[in-house]
A protein has these predicted regions:
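Bacterial C-terminal helix-turn-helix
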Residues: 2-69
């Protein structure tokens, strides 16, 4: 996994992707994946992510995540 992540970061740096854009895209994909794996159950997803459900709800809103499982 470290090798894949290193390759991805190298590619993003070479393409001039800004840190904030990379962080936002990672967060959006990571959170969406966890929610989908939890069958759309936000309480379970929040527990899996190690955050409070309210924090997850705020993150979903901030990241404009839609079409959850």
């Amino acid at each position: 996994m470290h090798k894949l992540l290193e390759q991805l970061v190298d590619e993003m740096v070479n393409r001039g992707v800004h840190y904030e854009d990379a962080q936002r895209e990672f967060d959006k994909r990571f959170v969406t994946q966890v929610i989908n794996k939890c069958g759309g159950n936000l309480c379970k997803a929040a527990d899996t992510l190690g955050v409070h459900r309210n924090t997850l709800s705020r993150k979903i809103k901030d990241l404009k995540i839609k079409n959850l499982a």
